[in-house]
């Protein structure tokens, strides 16, 4: 579970840009496919940015995240959206959704394919007939070791980011916080790179009838180079 410090950094340091960009493309994808999305669920929703976008679109938007700190921030941002603190491997709400999403390479936070399969089984159970599950995955060919990247957080606080590849199919994102020049906090987010073909096969095994994987959600949109987009229809 993310620490309170990381949740604050995530919320205030501009990491909303990805769900905002994805949300714009998702709404266009819904429009182009002539979908009637009355309900949506965002898994690993973080601070709830995509939930807010779907709420403003007019859907009955829900969100869930393993981190109570993220959900606290999401609830403070918009108290009209239903949020749950839960583990995706066991989360199975007693209702169905027209659209289920999971972004920010959250599936890559799950190390074992057996646990990914549990998530897919759950998602299939609460996806409505004719509904869709849309999520992203890290693209192995586009993820490599990086030099530390530093940004000012406040006048006295800096945040330092670095991505490394400690093993063949592993990624580590290190976040360090410096206050008045002192190293005060460090968090490491460990992810596993999954074979997109294996992921697509798992989705079909769990019952999804149509599965596609591409480097972009919209054919004419700029691709997000580190990401695969997977669309699974029920």
Positions of the model-derived regions?
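Class I SAM-dependent methyltransferase SAM/SAH-binding core
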Residues: 41, 48-90
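Conserved class I S-adenosyl-L-methionine
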Residues: 1-36
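A short glycine-rich, Lys/Arg-flanked "PGG" loop and its adjoining helix->strand segment in the class I
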Residues: 117-129
